[in-house]
Amino acid sequence: MEIDTDYLGSILMDIEDRVEYADIRAGTSRTSSILMKDGKLQEVKSGRASGFRIRVLRNGSWGFAFTDEPSRLGEMALKAIKMTGSLRGDVQVGSGAPSVDKTMVRSSRPPSDVPAAEKRELVSDAHHAASVDGVVSTTVSYVDMESSSAFLNSEGSLIEMAETRVALFLNAVASDGSGIQFGHKSCGGTGGFEILEREDIEELGRRTGEKAVRLLKASPPPSGRFDIVTDPELTGVFIHEALGHAAEADLILQGDSILEGKLGEKIASEGVTIIDDPTIDGFGSYSYDAEGVRAAETVLVENGVLTSLLNSRETAFKLGLEPSGNARSAIGDQPIVRMSNTYLKPGDLSFDELIEDIRNGVYLRGSRGGQVDTGKGIFQFNAAESFRIQDGEIAEPVKDVSLSGNVLETLKNVDGVGSDFRLGIGFCGKSGQSVPVGDGGPHVRIRNAMVGGT
């Protein structure tokens, strides 16, 4: 479906004298997915969708309406105006400079040009490779997404974007009759099928299965305070969940963030610099956010000091800050403050230097989920795989290890930042919405961390 931007512009012109601000997002998307479990194809899906949403600001309140029929957009505009009611709200967005632009993610192999049989073969190869001896169940999930969208607002912006993403997720379950363990790997990014072709899928699958089997023989988890090292995946999960969400300005305005009132304060050690950046190559990349704000790097923490927050136009105005380009949503949802690619900036230490003076510690790799209370600033994460560190050397494997504590205390106990870097892929949920994100960083050393079992 071609998006008629002239028609969308005429809808805005019809209502601009009746509202303080208005914008329209229109988009089309195509997705395909494959799910294989234990050697059998469970799902092979493909679909298309399109939609139009209009948002108006009137009397300090938002009105919002959505339709999948372009001919009803004028009707939806009136519905959105009516939703604002007669009572005065406190929402303002300030004035923004209009943007006129066309952007697209370039791909040498758009997923829609790749035969379904080739995608199934990729999934089958990954599944077969992960099914090593000792693995009793394997699941492989493939997904690709292609979308085109247009954004127009009453300030004169007209932005057209095309985005493409692909991802592959692998899970293996191993059992020895007395217990079970799990292995998980993923790959993908913003771009076409060529991203997965560059990966050694069989090696990725084999490592997934071998991890699960290896954990069956691991020792029980230690418990207490230890010096630890986290790998790039767990570093990224911690930064995303514990710091990134707390830096979302809507949570701060709701009184649900440990970072409330801390701008300009030192909240971490000198070596900690945390960045959210939708312009780098990652699963959470984009050129403009859902409010037409150009994407840009946001340095949240610089050398331990909280320097910025993630903002929408509304939250930025309320806090006296600049919009950061972090209002995100699907076409049919109200934009809310979200992360993009969030990571801890690498330092200059090698892995050997990070562990060399740890006499009795733990090396934590990967993530098996966890939980965070952004208001209280406490967290608990489960590592996918762990090892003892003895006298500066990696020693025996241990399983079911958890990391918990206070977010700010833990950030202040970071005293070594590795020179390596890896950015993972995933989907982040908030307020019933899901967006693609990247998170990562280097290996990191944390002193006196609380470690226990899951």
From Swiss-Prot:
Name this polypeptide is given: Metalloprotease MTH_856
One GO CC term, this protein: cytosol
Biological role: Probable metalloprotease.
One GO term (biological process): proteolysis
Family: Belongs to the peptidase U62 family.
Chain spans, region Disordered: 92-115
EC id: 3.4.-.-
Lineage, highest ranks first: Archaea, Methanobacteriati, Methanobacteriota, Methanomada group, Methanobacteria
A single GO molecular function term of this UniProt record: metallopeptidase activity
SUPFAM superfamilies with a match to the protein in the record: Putative modulator of DNA gyrase, PmbA/TldD
